[in-house]
Amino acid sequence: MLILSRKTNQKIFIGDSIELTIIEIRGDQVKVGVEAPRSVKIFRQEVYEEIQRENRAASDSPWSPNSLPQLPV
């Protein structure tokens, strides 16, 4: 893991298209601004972990399309 120290308003660049800006430092909390292409998915850790849990639960579900009633055509 690369560890970098930054002060307020300083930036970190990741590749050519992602820019992180330290917006504010207050106590043990840091506000970070992220500029990235829309195609880059960015999640807070707790949100990402919840998405992963939901995906695992959905894939473990015994549901199948065959369990739906047939609609008349």
UniProtKB/Swiss-Prot annotation:
GO CC entries: cytosol
Pfam families with a match to the protein in the record: CsrA
GO BP field: bacterial-type flagellum organization; mRNA catabolic process; negative regulation of translational initiation; regulation of bacterial-type flagellum assembly; regulation of carbohydrate metabolic process
SUPFAM superfamilies reported for this sequence: CsrA-like
InterPro entries cross-referenced by the UniProt entry: CsrA (IPR003751), CsrA_sf (IPR036107)
Residues covered by region (Disordered): 54-73
Keyword terms of this UniProt record: Bacterial flagellum biogenesis, Cytoplasm, Repressor, RNA-binding, Translation regulation
GO molecular function annotations of the record: mRNA 5'-UTR binding
Disulphides: none
Subcellular location: Cytoplasm
Keyword RNA-binding: yes
Residue ranges, compositional bias (Polar residues): 61-73
Its job: A translational regulator that binds mRNA to regulate translation initiation and/or mRNA stability. Usually binds in the 5'-UTR at or near the Shine-Dalgarno sequence preventing ribosome-binding, thus repressing translation. Its main target seems to be the major flagellin gene, while its function is anatagonized by FliW.
The protein's assembly and partners: Homodimer; the beta-strands of each monomer intercalate to form a hydrophobic core, while the alpha-helices form wings that extend away from the core.
Family membership noted in the UniProt record: Belongs to the CsrA/RsmA family.
Protein name: Translational regulator CsrA
Source organism of this protein record: Treponema pallidum (strain Nichols)
